[in-house]
Each structure stands twice: as structure tokens, then as C-alpha cells.
């Protein structure tokens, strides 16, 4: 497969390096000149428990890129989706497609820019971190799913899957890509909650006193999905049915235990959200990932007060008015406690 990967960080870099190693014709684009320069000079190095190798892959900044591609993988942070989609548009062939390998419901934004017929959905849940220019940690395997946003199973998504099998042999095609994306939104709300602290994902999810909070967050997101007519899909220990009000009383606990086990197997101990806040000291994807859910929920008369409060607390950490600590997670849990007592 000949493809352009727009965003060569944790997700795009890991995918691009593996595809290059398997013989695919990959070109990378990234906004960080120091990252591009390191890749040009030394190659893109993948490290971690799963694979350690260096891929020689051409890399460019957006302003130096020339050419046109039939397949472009968009792997930027969610809040950069619109600007990235507009920047890549001159490089997309008339019959080409853009695949969103991101967190969130970014296919909606991409479709607005490039057209729905040129937009392909993808769901990736593997663990990776950008460590330094030219170096990516591939910390843990996770689900890899591709699908048309209208639910059809087409030759192009089958071709993408065949290529992505060279990255992960478990890659699949789905007729319900929105189900995976909304499922990740529910799990993602839990990850944002863990990032209010300095605990690892696994340690935070294992804490008994916060489990009712995690369940309530997932329930809010899944209620909005249901209001949109979406049936959420499960992955890597996350079982959406376990968080429904009609689920057996121990179902959510079992799912959380499986999520803890999944995350303990990964060398990536903390979420990208935590890393944005604690290490890179930059804005997170919270508005593009969770803020949009609050807005969709309000429009559907399906309120999400816990999710809205979580967005506020992440903003507090971003602007320096709160610290990442269990006290901040307690501030979110207090709202849930007030709701339960109402």
C-alpha cells in the first residue's frame, strides 16, 4: 500500500514504521521540524517490549510536502483534525480516501472537509508514546479496526485491512465503525478521569472507591450513543453491555478488572492525556473528545453532567488552577455522590 500518514507521533509513527518495515510505500508528515529532522537523519526508531527497530521512511513538514496520494491516514490529535484535513486536501487524489486513526468522532469533521465518500473510519487502541524526536515507544497491542462510515464493507476497506495486517495480525473490518468509536468514547471518559491523577491507568481503574464513578461516566456516554441510534462495540476488556443499567450487578466490575489486566500488560502505563498534562504541558483533546459528547447529549435531551464536570476539571489542570492528584478525582466523584444522594 502506498500511503501518506499525516501526524507521525505515537499512533502515526508506530503504524508508519511497521508498514514501512513490511515493504509498504509510506511517507510521513509532522508539524515538529525536530521530529522530521531526526527521522531524516537517523530513521524512525521504535522501542518497547513488542518490537525494537529503526525504519527508514521519508518525512516532511506540511509546507515541504509535494505529491498526491490515494490513501492518507490522519493521525493528529483530535483538536487539530479540521486544520489538518484542510492542509492535506491538496495531497488527496480525486478518488482517494482519508482514514482517521485518532481518538474521538473525528470522521464527522473529516467528512465535512473532504466529503463523506472520501472518509474512512478506523479504531485503534494500541498503546504508544512519543518519547523524543525520532523515537516512539510501542508499549502494548490493542484492537485495530477499519470500516466505512456508512456501514458498507467495500473493497477499499478490505484492502486497508490487508495492509494493516502487516502491523497487527488481529486487524479486522467492521460494518459498525461508529459502534467502536462510541465505545472508545465511553472508555476514553474513564481515561480522562484517571488523568486527573498521577496514578497509572491500571492502578486508578483498580481503586474500589472510584469504580462507581467510572461506571457512571461510561453510562452517560453510552446513553448519548443510544440516543444517536448507535450500538457500542466492545474491545480489549471494555464490554459496553456491562455498563448498562440492566446489566448483572457484577458485570461492570468484571469489565473493569479486564481493563486493568489489559493495561498492566502494556509498557505504556499512563494515558496520552496524562502525558499531555504532566510531561508535554500542553492542551489535551478533551474538548474534541468529550466536549462534543456533552453538546450532542444536550441536543438529544440526554444530559451528561459528570462528563461536563470532567471537561471542566481537565481545563483546570491545563490552566494550572488544579494539580493532578486524587483530590481532583475526588472533586469529580463528589458530584457523582451528590447525584446518587439526590
Regions found by a protein language model. Give the residues of each.
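NAD(P)+-binding Rossmann beta1-loop-alpha1 motif at the extreme N-terminus of oxidoreductases
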Residues: 1-51
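Nucleotide donor/acceptor-binding cores
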Residues: 1, 70, 142
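Active-site lid/adjacent beta-loop-alpha segment flanking the redox-cofactor pocket in flavoenzymes
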Residues: 198-213
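Rossmann-like NAD(P)(H) cofactor-binding subdomain of soluble oxidoreductases
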Residues: 29, 53-135
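Short phosphate-binding/catalytic loops that engage adenosine nucleotides
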Residues: 24, 169, 230
Amino acid at each position: 500500500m502506498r500511503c501518506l500518514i499525516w501526524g507521525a507521533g505515537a499512533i502515526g509513527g508506530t503504524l508508519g514504521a511497521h508498514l514501512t518495515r513490511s515493504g509498504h510505500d509510506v511517507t510521513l508528515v509532522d508539524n515538529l521540524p525536530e521530529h522530521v529532522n531526526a527521522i531524516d537523519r537517523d530513521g524512525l526508531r521504535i522501542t518497547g517490549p513488542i518490537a525494537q527497530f529503526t525504519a527508514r521512511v521519508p518525512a516532511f513538514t506540511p509546507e515541504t510536502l509535494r505529491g498526491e496520494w490515494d490513501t492518507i491516514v490522519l493521525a493528529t490529535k483530535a483538536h487539530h483534525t479540521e486544520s489538518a484535513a484542510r492542509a492535506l486536501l491538496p495531497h488527496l487524489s480525486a478518488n482517494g480516501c482519508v482514514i482517521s486513526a485518532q481518538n474521538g468522532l473525528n470522521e464527522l469533521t473529516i467528512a465535512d472537509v473532504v466529503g463523506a465518500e472520501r472518509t474512512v473510519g478506523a479504531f485503534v487502541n494500541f498503546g504508544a508514546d512519543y518519547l523524543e524526536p525520532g523515537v516512539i515507544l510501542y508499549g502494548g497491542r490493542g484492537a485495530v479496526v477499519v470500516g466505512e462510515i456508512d456501514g458498507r464493507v467495500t473493497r477499499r476497506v478490505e484492502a486497508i485491512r490487508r495492509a494493516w495486517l502487516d502491523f497487527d495480525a488481529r486487524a479486522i473490518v467492521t460494518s459498525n465503525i461508529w459502534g467502536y468509536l462510541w465505545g472508545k468514547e465511553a472508555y476514553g471518559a474513564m481515561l480522562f478521569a484517571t488523568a486527573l491523577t498521577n496514578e497509572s491507568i491500571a492502578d486508578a481503574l483498580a481503586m474500589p472507591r472510584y469504580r462507581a464513578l467510572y461506571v457512571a461516566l461510561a453510562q452517560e456516554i453510552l446513553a448519548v450513543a443510544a440516543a444517536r441510534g448507535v450500538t457500542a462495540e466492545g474491545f480489549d476488556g471494555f464490554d459496553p453491555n456491562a455498563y448498562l443499567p440492566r446489566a448483572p450487578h457484577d458485570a461492570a466490575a468484571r469489565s473493569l478488572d479486564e481493563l486493568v489486566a489489559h493495561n498492566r500488560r502494556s509498557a505504556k502505563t499512563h494515558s496520552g492525556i496524562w502525558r499531555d498534562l504532566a510531561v508535554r504541558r500542553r492542551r489535551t483533546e478533551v474538548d474534541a473528545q468529550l466536549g462534543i459528547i456533552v453538546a450532542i447529549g444536550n441536543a438529544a435531551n440526554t444530559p451528561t453532567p459528570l462528563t461536563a464536570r470532567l471537561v471542566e476539571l481537565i481545563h483546570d489542570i491545563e490552566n494550572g488552577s488544579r494539580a493532578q492528584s486524587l483530590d481532583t478525582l475526588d472533586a469529580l466523584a463528589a458530584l457523582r455522590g451528590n447525584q446518587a444522594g439526590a
